[in-house]
Amino acid sequence: MSRSYYRTRIKFCGMTRAGDVRLAGELGVDAVGFIFARESSRRVAPAEARAMRQAIAPMVDVVALFRNNSKEEVREVLRTVRPTLLQFHGEEDESFCRSFNMPYLKAIAMGGREEVNARTLQLRYPSAAGFLFDSHAPGGGGGTGVAFDWGRIPTGLHRPFLLAGGLNPENVYDAVLATLPWGVDVSSGIELEPGIKDGYRMRTFVEEVRRADCTVLE
């Protein structure tokens, strides 16, 4: 590539402890995610997320993740947590996603067999700030810890995209080189158990992403 500088953004998702949030900031992570999807084992209450928000470093985005939540549930999180970005993982349509007047990412299920078309995505969600490609099947949730075939990511996207699904310190270097994403999103790959992050794996994940960034420029 002709760039003199290349930097993949990093999002740590499924945060449940203030100490993990604080370490994410120290490691230079760009965003932390709180999950409000009802069926998630990493779900936190809005009041819990608000308390953890105090540990977030300046210039780190706060992402609120939803999956088929009601509008009132989303609004409660907006009032209580004050996220900077929303992320929708369910069957939410464009009208629902844009109704909160907030930038949002739309998660795209890559666990099925149906081909994903860039033009179709951009027509379906024209106001999306970007897309997140995850390994869950249509109708399922994220955080599976299983990767999908990165070659299935559609070409021709005119919006930034994040790569998710089964990423960990062992494979994120290859993932970045294979897909050149705007960002990577990890949850289970840096955990001891759901919601409990491992400091060593968090640090190693960041180091591997930065190593990949340097390799892109070679």
Swiss-Prot record:
InterPro entries: Aldolase_TIM, PRAI_dom, RibuloseP-bd_barrel, TrpF_fam
Record keywords, A-Z: Amino-acid biosynthesis, Aromatic amino acid biosynthesis, Isomerase, Tryptophan biosynthesis
Domain of life: Bacteria
EC number, as in UniProt: 5.3.1.24
Pfam family, one: PRAI
Keyword Amino-acid biosynthesis in record: yes
UniProt family annotation: Belongs to the TrpF family.
Name this polypeptide is given: N-(5'-phosphoribosyl)anthranilate isomerase
Organism: Stenotrophomonas maltophilia (strain K279a)
